[in-house]
Amino acid sequence: ISKNLWDISSEEMMKYTRMILEKQHPALENVDQPMFVYVLTMREHGPYELGMENTFNLQMPNLGAKSISALNDYTQRIVALNDAIEGMNNYLHERKKPFVLGYFGDHQVAFDNVVPPKKGDYAQPDYVTQFVVRSNCASQFKQEQCFLDLAFSGGILMNVAGLSADDEFMKANMAMCKLSNGKLEDSSNPAFVNDYRHYLYQTLKIAK
């Protein structure tokens, strides 16, 4: 890919994802095990258009005209992303093969250094985003948390897929998710979180 990542549409990224799943590269021809594909889209990221019309009729007292324009641009990009995700979800269902599709946003958006106020009682509201999982697997998974640190997202995907952890790191990660009600950075028990990190880095030595 020779394009700047910021210029590649989310739909184009989904096209490349389908090519991977269909093993359209020689290096994938003999792969006969389940594949994990991580896709990063950047088209939703700034910079945003500052001269766009207020197509979505957006109003917010603390945002100026340029920020409203940027918010319209951001919104149309999110609409395009949603269409791309829905298309991928339909594609995965039509393949009639087991799949787990998870997607999330990595941070909140800001316009002209103005961060819109967030709803909800969160310790770090500017870092709260969404995490969605879809699947056609006959899973016994039940959502137990109303909040989830993205550090635990891998374990959730495994649970939905009906997979158990084979290594000590994932066993600890999945156990911590349950014991801490899905919280890590937002936990009200920092000593417990520090014990978890000590176990990961000092006992398991997951990083050097």
Report each predicted region and the residues it spans.
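Solvent-exposed soluble domains appended to multi-pass membrane proteins
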Residues: 1-208
